[in-house]
Amino acid sequence: MANHKSAMKRIKQTAKRTERNKHERSTLRTFIKRVREAVATKDQEAAKAALAVAIPVIDGAATKGIIHSSNASRNVSRLTKLVNTLG
């Protein structure tokens, strides 16, 4: 356990940030999953709509530092390629 006031504050801040980041990461995964599910059902319109919603969420997570910017770019690229395979 922390002995200093500042260390205790840091522990609280870290816990709060961890919870916030968990929620953001979970939301991110949900939107990515929606795109993949739409592609799996071969519904091109739904896949494009899901991708249009997912891209800003992915970019926002990169901006907030939840994921690395390279990870965000890779996700967007792969999902876009996946949706484009539908025709």
UniProtKB/Swiss-Prot annotation:
InterPro entries: Ribosomal_bS20 (IPR002583), Ribosomal_bS20_sf (IPR036510). Residues 1-15 have a biased composition (Basic residues). SUPFAM superfamilies: Ribosomal protein S20. Residues 1-27 are annotated as: Disordered. It comes from the Bacteria. GO terms for biological process: translation. GO terms for cellular component: cytosol; small ribosomal subunit. Residues 16-27 have a biased composition (Basic and acidic residues). Keywords: Ribonucleoprotein, Ribosomal protein, RNA-binding, rRNA-binding. GO terms for molecular function: small ribosomal subunit rRNA binding; structural constituent of ribosome. Disulfide bonds: none annotated. Binds directly to 16S ribosomal RNA. Belongs to the bacterial ribosomal protein bS20 family. This is Small ribosomal subunit protein bS20. It comes from Citrifermentans bemidjiense (strain ATCC BAA-1014 / DSM 16622 / JCM 12645 / Bem). The lineage of its organism: Bacteria, Pseudomonadati, Thermodesulfobacteriota, Desulfuromonadia, Geobacterales.
